[in-house]
Every structure is written in structure tokens, then in C-alpha cells.
Amino acid sequence: MIRHLLKVCGIKGKVLVCLALLSFLGGLAAAPALAQTAADQQVLPGTPAGSAPPEEKKETAPSTAGPMITDTAVPIDTGHVSLSVLSALSCYPGFFNSNWRTVTAGGNFYTFYMPVKVTYGPAKNTEVYLIAPFIDYWGNNVSIPGPNGQRSASYAGIGDLTLMGKYNLLPEGDVMPAVSAVAGFASIPTGHASHLNPGLLGVDAIGTGALTFTTGVNLFKWVKPFLLYSNIWINSPVNIYQNNSENVVSREYITFNLAAEYPLTPKFVALLEFYSNWTWSNIYTPQGYQTPETLLGIMPGLEFLATEKLSFEAGASLDLAGKNGVKKYTPMLTASYSF
């Protein structure tokens, strides 16, 4: 057929037919390349063909200094150490009687309280901390004078130590809070509590005289924009006296604390806490031994994150209600540094 066309069209026809044939063959060769280019356009730049799209990074809670009274649930990082120093000044406007009413304190009493807290993470999901408080307790214009007519007195020293351990049982989930188990000694009787001097009007009692074993759970949940904390502890004190050959089991009590943080800016965080202790008797508690004390209060505060490692907190605890215990108002300031 091609020879027939060449004969009919002559030399010019030969040229035209050759050009047409070359164009047809070139189109066949270019078709696969065009198809490959079109397929390549379906793949995002920098993404291998057939790979899954990258997962979105889960949003985490903002950094805060943590509550001042309520214990945290998430342990410190492994191998890290933090140091916290709290300064608090308590004044006592009265006492709570057995009917939940406030009665006179019988004088002007004050306490300067400065605990130093050292926290360490020995292993993953584990934390231990030690609290050593310095206490200065004084009073004046006391209504009932001492043996020599004293109406004012003061006493200072180291109070009871606290040694606690914490282990994170469950991490925070989409619905479930983070849960940590807590166990240790809320009070180790290192503070002066026995053989009191009557001339010091009771202000030399800066310790409980009890070895208090504590166990419970700490909870944490970020419910945007709030960071929520809770403590539920049971405390079992055993009173130890040098002039008593047998240890005496004191009244057990429950500690129930709540705290909420609200980040105002990347540097400032608002804080509100509720604290309480609830006391009852068990079958081993001697009747009439240590009047059961119950206390409820709140503490508003403000946190300032100076750097990634240094933070400050200020607040004031206000005892709102109670039974058979002291009533006090306590402004406080905390400085914390993480190593």
C-alpha cells in the first residue's frame, strides 16, 4: 500500500508519507511517558507512593507549677530532682468546738511554717519525696497564764518529717484520669511533742508525736482548659510517748483534697484548692482518746512560671468549717526549682 502511494504521489508524496509515519511512531513512544507523569501527579511531594498520611500529634496539657496543698498524680521524670521551699504565716482567730462553731482562741497565736521539700524520680513512673519543716510558734495576751504568770511565749524547731512514695498505675487517657498509688509516712515524730513546759503555754508542741502511715490514690485529668487534681488518703497514726511503754493507736482520718488550675497566659496560672480532713474512731481507739478533728477549707492562689525550671506560687488558705480543732488563716508563698 505504501509503494502504491509513493508511485501515485511522486517525490513530494514520498516526503509527506515518511513524515506521517514518523509522527505516528513518535506518538506511540511518548504515550507511556505521559501516562507515567499523570500518575506521578497523584502522589504528594516528599511522600513515598503507597504510604499512609502522617498522624496528628496528640495535644498535651500546658505546663504549670502544680497545686500548693494537693499532691500531684504524675511522677517527676526519671533521674530528675526538684526542690521546693514554702513560707507560710498562720494566725488563729479561734477554735472549732464540737458543734462546728468558732470560739475564742484564748489569746493571740501565730505560726511561721517553712517546709523544704525534695522530690526525686528513682525509676520510671516512680517518685519519692521528703519534707522537713521549720516551725516557729508563738503567742501573746494569753487568757490563762503560766505557772509564773507568763502570758506570752515562743518556741522554734524542726517539726515532723514526711516521707512518701508514689507510683503511676494508669496514664491519663481520653476519658480516664491518671491514677497514682501513694504510700508512706505523713508524719515521722521528729517534732517536739512530749514533756511540754507549762511556762511555754503550749507553744512548744510543734510535733504530733505520732508515726502516721498513709496510703491512698492521687488523680489527675486535663479537661480543657482546666487541670484537675484529687487526693484520697487514709491516715493511720500511732502515738509514741517516751513516758508510755506501749504505743497508742490514734484516731484514723481521711484526707480529701481537690484542686483546679486555669492557665491565664503561658506564664500565669490561676489556682483554686479545697482541702479537708475527716476523723472517726475504730474498735482499737480508746474511748475519749484524742477528740476527733475535722477540717474543711479553700485556698485561692496564683502561679508564675518564671522559666522552664523556676516557678513561684502565692495563695492563702482559709479554714471555713471544722470540729474540735484550730481555725487559722494562712498566706503562703512557694518557690520551686527543677534540676
Please give the residue ranges for each predicted region:
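Outer-membrane pore/translocation modules
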Residues: D136-S245
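Detector for outer-membrane/organellar transmembrane beta-barrel domains
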Residues: T78-L86, L201-Y284, Y337
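Outer membrane beta-barrel transmembrane domains
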Residues: G94-F96, N247-F339
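Transmembrane beta-barrel strands of outer-membrane/channel proteins
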Residues: V85-C91, L130-F134, V182-I188, S230-S236, ...
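Surface-exposed strand-loop-strand hairpins of Gram-negative outer-membrane beta-barrel proteins
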Residues: P53-K58, A88-Y113, V203
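Short loop/turn motifs that connect adjacent beta-strands in outer-membrane beta-barrel proteins
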Residues: D71-H80, N125, L170-S180, P225, ...
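Residues that define the transmembrane beta-barrel architecture of outer-membrane proteins
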Residues: N108-M114, S154-L161, A178, G207-F213, ...
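Residues on the lipid-exposed face of transmembrane beta-strands in outer-membrane beta-barrel proteins
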Residues: D71-T72, L83, S87, V116-Y120, ...
